[in-house]
Amino acid sequence: YTVSNRVALGLRVEVDGKNGYAGTQTAQDAEELVARAIDNARTVEQTDENPMQTAQEYESVEFPACPLCGLSIQEKIELAKSMEQKAKAADARVFQTPHCVVSTGRMARRLKNTRGLDASVREESGAIALQAAVREDEEIHDGFAVRTGAAALDVDGCVTEAVQKAVACFGAASVRSGKMPVLFDREAASDLLGAFSGMFCADMAQKGLSPLTGKEGQM
């Protein structure tokens, strides 16, 4: 079980109509932070076109509560253990769970300045994730599933999905080359698009590194 905390402080100052920026993850460096922000503003050659906000009215937004965030540390550990146990009980061919994770997080953010702006937001999030590895004779496959938000306590659904994805790969084989109708799983479609995403990059096309260069507007 691991816990990590991160605090970040960003400062924006206005000096002679120019904005300077600086950031730190150590609150003790306040004086240095101010000095760096002022120094940054003095290096700017043009007047900033984004004036600082004054006091504003913001609509109150209620974020849904995370069901995992209310659990104790021990309860989260037990939840992870139960996922592994249920995965192995779901199918005798499950021999390992390389990833079995229960994760929660809380975030607080605040914007405040000397002109009256004071806005803040707090959020919490949680997720469970499982990778189930299955083996039959010489074949080994794995399946992955995740649940987030209000569904983060759906352990049974997460386990079933991960195991079914893994088991479904048994007996799979390459098909002959040819032209034929294809049904894409949504994750497979995403992976395929990702493999070719560089082709659609304007920078790659302008450099002549994309096979789509010069084919704009074609179908």
Name each model-derived stretch.
Residues 1-103, 150-179, 184, 213-214:
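Alpha/propeptide regions of enzymes that mature by internal proteolysis
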Residues 64-66, 78, 95, 102-219:
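Active-site-adjacent "lid" and substrate-binding segments of diverse enzymatic cores
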